[in-house]
């Protein structure tokens, strides 16, 4: 691989039409230090960072040209706290321009330096995409995923109650060792933390990822057609997986869209009247 600091930054290639009508995708780093087995980034052996001064200079040029919506595609934006804080400080100094910023964040890494900064941003000007993937520690261990759930809870509480950050959390259905009951528990636990969106994704077999090492022990069966989605596992039957596909569809339509807030209130009230008081199982049965 070439030295990342020798790569010419490409942001001058954005046209004025791009800047006026599209998201501006940017990156300050490439690679990921984590080894989550379902993710293509697990194949990258290192994290490389662009020259920060040059990067910030390019961001200034984009702002001067009228860019207002920035989506960072760094796999782990808050990996380096000094870099993360410098970039946040830069955009905070221009926040009066009505900027919107999107970052992918590690859920259990939110030290005071970052907390103090994001509290200063206006409501809705930042979105954090936070990968949880599973709430079950054993399942997380199966796929080499690390989450400090105590810190995750603390950080979500902070984001929901002390900042205006919009939070988008991810869960994956079909991970090796996770049944529907375990997923339901994790979904309900996550929902109680108050993220603005929960994306329920279905596991996909990405070429070259080590998730395939579990195929035999957990009887993982994937579709032979793109996007190579999981069809069943030892713990989730084909019928259950189809129900989870419907669950994900209706959850996205009703909850994540934000278009059915009154309906969501009614569903929440209905869930509280059940013995389990589970929002997951209430929507699961409604989507059958």
Please place each PLM-identified region on the residue numbering.
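Intrinsically disordered, low-complexity segments used for protein-protein interactions
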Residues: 32, 234, 241-243, 284, ...
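Short acidic (Asp/Glu) and glycine-rich catalytic loops that position anionic groups and cofactors
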Residues: 35-38, 64-69, 220-228, 259-263, ...
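Radical SAM [4Fe-4S] cluster-binding motif and immediate context
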Residues: 8-161
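A structural motif corresponding to the C-terminal lobe/cap of the Radical SAM core domain
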Residues: 81, 93-109, 113-277
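Glycine-rich beta-alpha loop elements in corrinoid/cobalamin-binding modules
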Residues: 1-2
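Terminal or standalone catalytic/regulatory effector modules within metabolic enzymes
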Residues: 274-288
